[in-house]
Amino acid sequence: MSPKITHVNPETLHKNPAFSQAVLVEGGKTLYIGGQNGVLADGSLAGPDFATQTEQIYRNLLKILHSVGASQKNLVKQTIFVVKGQNLQAGLAAAQKVWGPFPAAISVVFVEGLGQPGRGVLIEVDAIAVVDA
């Protein structure tokens, strides 16, 4: 059974094409995606800058989703951890180049650092998707 995913954006709340205020899911299985960094298949960082790392994260998310027969439309929630000092708007623009117009519910958290100190990791994204049952 294919899940029914409805993006909820009440008229009385702010609208933004980059995210939904809430996502209602009926049916399907839940896929929990652990924190993704902007790394290549060999584990090296895709680049030292925020935009390059962000683009790679969304490429990696697509690979994970495709591996279970899903796509961007199945992603319902993202938590985005950004190292303080990064330009969030530049990161969101970089993500959209890879991801397109699929607005999951999101939370953004600015942090002092991420789980790989000294490596130069500037962003991490974990996510939840709903896939066919």
Residue ranges of predicted features:
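N-terminal presequence-like segments and the immediate start of the first folded domain
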Residues: 1-59, 63-76, 82-133
